[in-house]
Amino acid sequence: MRINPTTSGPGVSTLEEKNQGRIVQIIGPVLDVAFSPGKMPNIYNALIVKGQDTVGQQINVTCEVQQLLGNNRVRAVAMSATDGLTRGMEVIDTGAPLSVPVGGATLGRIFNVLGEPVDNLGPVDTRTTSPIHRSAPAFIQLDTKLSIFETGIKVVDLLAPYRRGGKIGLFGGAGVGKTVLIMELINNIAKAHGGVSVFGGVGERTREGNDLYIEMKESGVINEQNLAESKVALVYGQMNEPPGARMRVGLTALTMAEYFRDVNEQDVLLFIDNIFRFVQAGSEVSALLGRMPSAVGYQPTLSTEMGSLQERITSTKEGSITSIQAVYVPADDLTDPAPATTFAHLDATTVLSRGLAAKGIYPAVDPLDSTSTMLQPRIVGEEHYETAQRVKQTLQRYKELQDIIAILGLDELSEEDRLTVARARKIERFLSQPFFVAEVFTGSPGKYVGLPETIRGFRLILSGELDGLPEQAFYLVGNIDEATAKAMNLDEESKLKK
């Protein structure tokens, strides 16, 4: 962390003495720069290209040194578009890595990868900045305490609970609800836990980033009147950005989160949407840097790049960073190297299922594929563990019977299996839940369900006490009392129709 005595631009540190070079080659977002002998910049140093294009427009491009090539040349990746750059342009070595503003000044604001505000709300206090490249906390600084992080979402809290200070992956293909689930988590956590969040939009749709910002202002997560009371800082490097920006924007967001953890000693939530785009950006740059591609065309440094980001996301004795990462799964293939590498770092996985989304069950979290290292009786308690296991067994049995039902029909099943199917269908529907952030689509008010209420509801379904209720009564409700009330309403409606 650096305390800057004077307020300078947020992207890089003050230039003490200018070490100048010249562009000798441009290949898309990758630049080769020649420096004087003995004046070579270090790896990860920020370089600034300043000049004018052919129509007299001012150019200001920041790059990051990736390789030292020999012959006094370095290869750097641009953090913004390289349009208008020409060979021979002057390049200045800043002598330090990219540094971004950190602390309370970042709350309620939107930044780009360089830490520059992009929300037209004026400049940000840049007296306290921090470099985006730093090592992970030492082993002795880590905190190993195990505790559950309640989200208020039934299917998550019961079957794949999140660890406070852990890493959670949201897996799913395109259009199954990852971003909506992330927005709901930000909303619930800000309201129920009062925690500070940092949101890193890595290579996703600009429209979604804008929607999220407006949604946060409406829900009070961002306080427009007093930004210091906001609960989130936003860092965006969206789909339209060059790969250099998408590759580094995750580190910018993480740097801001680390300050809240290490200096302010807070529990922080770091959302990354989408970690796959981080890998994809690295893959785009990798070939231009002259590396041979690895499996399925990914960069050979995939594991190293992922590890350097993920190992910094951890709990220390000062505070914690709980990270929730959306993971796009290419062609719904979980064995693809990008999602497979991400799996190794996670404490819990929330897998979204296209089949459930097609049935209209939202959140479309697959109760059998989603896992958590926290679902152990010594951590969550016997009652929670036993209820979760029985729910999974019932749903697994229903899955096994589906082929028989499709061929022969329900009537060919034994009495016991018919009862299992009926309860499984109720459980499946009760795992759905109306979201606060989806009120505009569904027209139903959102529900936050505490863990004790969630366990009580599923125990009642498993016990058979609610066997007489219609299964549609369990669809898109909060706790079990709402389901029984809905059943009574349905009963009255059917009587009126008769």
Curated annotation (Swiss-Prot):
Pfam family, one: ATP-synt_ab_N
Binding sites annotated in the UniProt record for ATP: G172, G173, A174, G175, V176, G177, K178, T179
Record-linked NCBIfam families: atpD
Bilayer topology annotation: Peripheral membrane protein
Family assignment from sequence similarity: Belongs to the ATPase alpha/beta chains family.
Protein name: ATP synthase subunit beta, chloroplastic
Record InterPro entries: AAA+_ATPase (IPR003593), ATP-synt_VA_C (IPR055190), ATP_synth_F1_bsu (IPR005722), ATPase_a/bsu_AS (IPR020003), ATPase_alpha/beta_chains (IPR050053), ATPase_F1/V1/A1_a/bsu_N (IPR004100), ATPase_F1/V1/A1_a/bsu_N_sf (IPR036121), ATPase_F1/V1/A1_a/bsu_nucl-bd (IPR000194)
Catalytic activity: ATP + H2O + 4 H(+)(in) = ADP + phosphate + 5 H(+)(out)
SUPFAM superfamilies tied to this protein: C-terminal domain of alpha and beta subunits of F1 ATP synthase, N-terminal domain of alpha and beta subunits of F1 ATP synthase, P-loop containing nucleoside triphosphate hydrolases
Intracellular or extracellular location(s): Plastid, Chloroplast thylakoid membrane
PROSITE patterns the record matches: ATPASE_ALPHA_BETA (PS00152)
Function, as annotated: Produces ATP from ADP in the presence of a proton gradient across the membrane. The catalytic sites are hosted primarily by the beta subunits.
Annotated EC: 7.1.2.2
Subunit-level organization: F-type ATPases have 2 components, CF(1) - the catalytic core - and CF(0) - the membrane proton channel. CF(1) has five subunits: alpha(3), beta(3), gamma(1), delta(1), epsilon(1). CF(0) has four main subunits: a(1), b(1), b'(1) and c(9-12).
GO biological process: proton motive force-driven mitochondrial ATP synthesis
